[in-house]
């Protein structure tokens, strides 16, 4: 076998093992002297090459892509039209409909079809992947591209199965789908957090998602409701199958403190983001809190309030 033929055979073998693009396969093999084992190790240590492979493998031929898009467009129109009918019943003077937007009424119909409650935590990662900017609204572009990214889920049955996978990815804080990582990295505003797990990204996303239109901060009522929804899914939360230690009782104390002591003040983005870190570090009796660390003052105030209000019999160290 000639040298060129041998390299071609190695290239085919390497691509079968890794699904690397031709460009990445040639580059990596050349860098490692066409030795399969070190080249394979290099591929799996090269995040961009893996992203390229994922995007390439999910690229459909034109006919198949057109068929997937047609099915997703039909589903989008079904829920958009259902939402438009619902909105007209509720508001005779409704604004002219946007043909590329599913509204709240349509989102509820979508939930019915998927057999999932809009109050189910899995609706948050779904909204994240479908790039919903606010509760109960989906654009045509976000809907189609999101479901394509989520295992080409172009039927209701496929989407139901995908939701169960998505739920587990959230609970396990699995890495984002590679195509979404590539999108995050291409945006300077999100590039630094592109390698965070799905739960962390969804927790961050929820702050803007739950905000009322035109508001910079999150209304306390909404913050409490969404903490109730999203925190029990956190890897930091104590539940079956989790190594987390933050408890429902601690969350209840936090909610009580905010309700009783802050006069209904809206929750800042800094408080929302850092509270997740707080749940990772605090112990059961709050005795290990570091007041010299750069926590938002409201978290320091919360710990002081707990120490004043939790009975000594509950194990609180008040020294």
From Swiss-Prot:
Keywords (alphabetical) are: Ubl conjugation pathway
Keyword S-adenosyl-L-methionine on entry:
no
Q: Which purpose does this protein serve, as stated in its record?
A: May contribute to neddylation of cullin components of SCF-type E3 ubiquitin ligase complexes. Neddylation of cullins play an essential role in the regulation of SCF-type complexes activity.
- Pfam families in the cross-refs: Cullin_binding, UBA_4
Domain UBA-like intervals: 7-44
Q: Which gene encodes it?
A: DCN1
Tell me a Gene Ontology molecular-function term this record carries. Answer: ubiquitin-like protein binding
Q: Taxonomically, which superkingdom? A: Eukaryota
Q: Which InterPro entries does the record cross-reference, listed alphabetically?
A: DCN-prot, DCN1-like_PONY, PONY_dom, UBA-like_sf
Instruction: List cellular component terms (GO).
Output: ubiquitin ligase complex
Q: Which PANTHER family match?
A: DCN1-LIKE PROTEIN 3 (PTHR12281:SF31), RP42 RELATED (PTHR12281)
Name it: Defective in cullin neddylation protein 1
Query: Which stretches make up the DCUN1 domain?
Result: 67-307
Instruction: List GO BP terms, alphabetically.
Output: protein neddylation
Note the SUPFAM superfamilies from the entry. UBA-like
At the highest ranks, the source species' classification is: Eukaryota, Fungi, Dikarya, Basidiomycota, Ustilaginomycotina
């Amino acid at each position: 076998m000639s040298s060129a033929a041998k390299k071609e055979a190695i290239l085919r073998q390497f691509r079968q093992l890794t699904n690397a693009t031709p460009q990445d396969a040639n580059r990596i093999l050349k860098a490692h002297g066409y030795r399969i084992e070190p080249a394979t190790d290099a591929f799996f240590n090269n995040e961009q090459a893996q992203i390229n492979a994922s995007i390439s493998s999910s690229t459909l031929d034109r006919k198949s892509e057109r068929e997937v898009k047609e099915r997703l467009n039909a589903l989008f129109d079904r829920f958009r039209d259902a939402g438009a009918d619902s909105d007209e019943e509720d508001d005779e003077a409704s604004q002219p409909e946007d043909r590329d937007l599913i509204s709240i009424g349509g989102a509820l119909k979508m939930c019915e079809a998927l057999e999932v409650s809009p109050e189910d935590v899995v609706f948050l990662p779904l909204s994240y992947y479908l790039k919903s900017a606010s509760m109960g609204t989906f654009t045509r572009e976000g809907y189609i591209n999101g479901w394509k990214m989520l295992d080409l889920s172009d039927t209701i049955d496929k989407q139901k199965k995908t939701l169960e996978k998505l739920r587990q990815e959230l609970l396990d804080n699995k890495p984002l789908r590679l195509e979404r990582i590539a999108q995050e990295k291409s945006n300077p505003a999100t590039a630094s957090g592109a390698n965070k797990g799905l739960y962390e990204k969804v927790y961050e996303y929820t702050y803007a998602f739950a905000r009322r239109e035109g508001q910079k901060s999150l209304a306390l009522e909404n913050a409490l409701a969404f903490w109730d929804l999203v925190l029990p899914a956190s890897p930091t939360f104590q539940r079956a199958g989790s190594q987390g230690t933050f408890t429902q009782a601690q969350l209840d104390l936090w909610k009580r403190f905010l309700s009783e002591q802050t006069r209904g003040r809206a929750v800042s983005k800094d408080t929302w983001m850092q509270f997740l870190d707080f749940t990772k570090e605090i112990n059961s009796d709050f005795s290990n809190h570091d007041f010299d660390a750069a926590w938002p003052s409201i978290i320091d105030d919360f710990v002081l309030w707990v120490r004043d209000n939790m009975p000594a019999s509950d194990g609180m160290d008040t020294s």
